[in-house]
Regions:
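N-terminal positioning helix adjacent to the helix-turn-helix/winged-helix DNA-binding module
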Residues: 13-17, 32, 79, 106
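The alpha-helix within a helix-turn-helix
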Residues: 37
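Short, locally clustered residues in the helix-turn-helix/winged-helix DNA-binding domain
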Residues: 19-26, 88
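N-terminal amphipathic alpha-helix
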Residues: 1-20, 117-121
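C-terminal regulatory/oligomerization modules of transcriptional regulators
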Residues: 105-131
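Charged, amphipathic alpha-helical coiled-coil/dimerization segments
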Residues: 52-109
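Key DNA-contact positions within bacterial/archaeal DNA-binding proteins
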Residues: 45
Length: 131
């Protein structure tokens, strides 16, 4: 809700998928559906469906492995890279510039608060897992 509006037909998950694919590629991984599923902790059928949607819209391209034609890899198209650039890097660059007025003291306080919140959530999760 706080991000800039996406183009018609583009789901917020598309940006998350492309971010995940780029992160995996930077690690030297040739990305497959299973890699996205594992990295995002999502079920494979849902990932498969979203990847098909993104491919149909021109944001992703699937291609067969040269070594094993049964293996299919996924890459971001130029159109996908443009979308990712606009709604990721540009947005966060503008946001970073806007956050420049936050003092070091305020930033440290925020970090402590987030860390405390995370610790509480982890403890609650452990309690739920025991049930």
């Amino acid at each position: 809700e706080l991000l800039p509006p996406l183009p018609q037909g583009v789901m917020p998950s598309y940006i998350q998928y492309m971010d995940t694919i780029q992160k995996l590629e930077k690690q030297g991984i040739k990305v497959k559906i299973s890699d996205i599923s594992d990295a995002m902790n999502l079920p494979r059928p849902g990932v498969t469906r979203t990847v098909k949607e993104m491919e149909a819209k021109g944001y992703l391209h699937k291609f067969a492995s040269k070594e094993d034609g049964r293996v299919t890899y996924i890459a971001i198209t130029e159109e996908g890279k443009k979308l990712s650039q606009k709604y990721d890097k540009d947005y966060f660059w503008e946001l970073a510039c806007s956050l420049g007025d936050i003092s070091e003291e305020d930033a440290d306080c925020m970090i402590r608060t987030i860390e405390k919140f995370y610790q509480i959530m982890c403890e609650r999760r452990k309690e739920y897992d025991k049930r």
